Amino acid sequence: MAVPRRKTSPSRRGMRRSADAIKKPTYVEDKDSGELRRPHHLDLKTGMYKGRQVLKKKES
């Protein structure tokens, strides 16, 4: 069975665990509608993605 040669220092252990934190999702303001949306996702109100109409406009 594989065994580590040296004890992992608290600093190195902390650096490894730094990626485990839960991060807040990023939002950007849409240029056309001004609504907040996730980056690289389409705007559900307008149905636009990268300047193209992908979905039909949502009727409210």
UniProtKB/Swiss-Prot annotation:
One CC-aspect GO term: cytosolic large ribosomal subunit
Biased composition (Basic residues): 1-16
Comp. bias regions, Basic and acidic residues: 17-44
Keywords: Ribonucleoprotein, Ribosomal protein
Ribonucleoprotein among keywords: yes
Region (Disordered): 1-60
GO MF annotation: an example: structural constituent of ribosome
Record-linked Gene3D superfamilies: Single helix bin
GO biological process annotation, one example: translation
Family: Belongs to the bacterial ribosomal protein bL32 family.
Protein name as it appears in the record: Large ribosomal subunit protein bL32
Organism: Bradyrhizobium diazoefficiens (strain JCM 10833 / BCRC 13528 / IAM 13628 / NBRC 14792 / USDA 110)
